[in-house]
């Protein structure tokens, strides 16, 4: 029987081109890029090169490109970052009730720290009903 994988929101297969590009770092180039020894400096150079490539691809400045360890960490950064950057404009954040736990838990944390969270209900197809407003 042919396998059908349906959990792409959790993880996805790695494209061969990506694996080929990453394999040297999995095998030998795994130094801590914050370290001062040679293997760390090599890792930092590779990380900087990757950052430059991504920045060029999305037409941004390399200083605006951040790498995270996972989607949950990226979600946390995004929500905390927006909340902090815009706190002078208000403390009300609106999201949906079906967000990933990384967003929902961050929202709960922000509520405990003075933010007002609104969790919009969604329709069976996942869309938001404008009548709720």
Task: Map each language-model feature to its residues.
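Pyridoxal 5′-phosphate
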Residues: 1-133
């Amino acid at each position: 029987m042919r396998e059908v994988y349906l959990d792409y929101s959790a993880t996805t297969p790695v494209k061969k081109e990506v694996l080929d590009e990453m394999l040297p770092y999995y095998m030998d180039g795994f130094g801590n890029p914050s370290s001062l020894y040679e293997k760390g400096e090599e890792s930092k150079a590779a990380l900087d090169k990757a950052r430059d490539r991504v920045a060029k691809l999305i037409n941004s400045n390399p200083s605006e490109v951040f790498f995270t360890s996972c989607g949950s960490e990226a979600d946390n950064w995004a929500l905390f970052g927006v909340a902090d950057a815009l706190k002078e404009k208000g403390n009300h954040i609106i999201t949906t009730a079906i967000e990933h736990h990384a967003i929902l838990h961050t929202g709960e944390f922000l509520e405990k720290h003075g933010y007002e969270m609104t969790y919009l209900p969604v329709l069976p197809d996942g869309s938001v009903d404008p009548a709720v407003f």
